[in-house]
Amino acid sequence: MLDFDDVQNVLDKLPALTDASEAHGTLCGLLLGRQDYNRWLECTLEQMPDKGDLLVAERLQVLQELFEQSKVQLNTEDMSLEVLLPEEDHAFDERLVGLASWCQGFLYGLGIGGESLLEALSEQGRECLDDLLQISQLGHDEEENDETETVYSELVEHVRLSVIYMNEEINPLISSPQVH
């Protein structure tokens, strides 16, 4: 998976409407609605860049790679989805805000898919969605300590598993037929 700082650097140079966490959350929400790469770019960038520019093309290649990696991660049975967030070398409040931004982006991307996506969710799937809504409202008011770090890690894992669960409800994986 691409590094948060690398993706953030690319988005800063294009320029983007969001940070890397929110952009990745939007991407995952859009993927649940089977949206494509260009739709994600429209939601993420201030304007569509000139693809003929070599520097722009290199930057777009990074975003294309993130799109493809995320698509594969969401559509495999190994539950390998990684949530793109600031790494541990970033300040705790920055990581917490990154998680909230990721959830905001996910909700935005999922909302673009329309009401039919939400209707496909079971009661448990809607509870997952409600949890992400609550997490999207987290702020800077937590001091970092061992307990908050543990809670943060648990929230990240809950977000990851919730998205995988909702994706499975909206887009059930098609298992290959078993040969007897």
Model-found features: residue ranges?
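Domain-length accessory/inserted modules outside core catalytic folds
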Residues: 1-103, 107-180
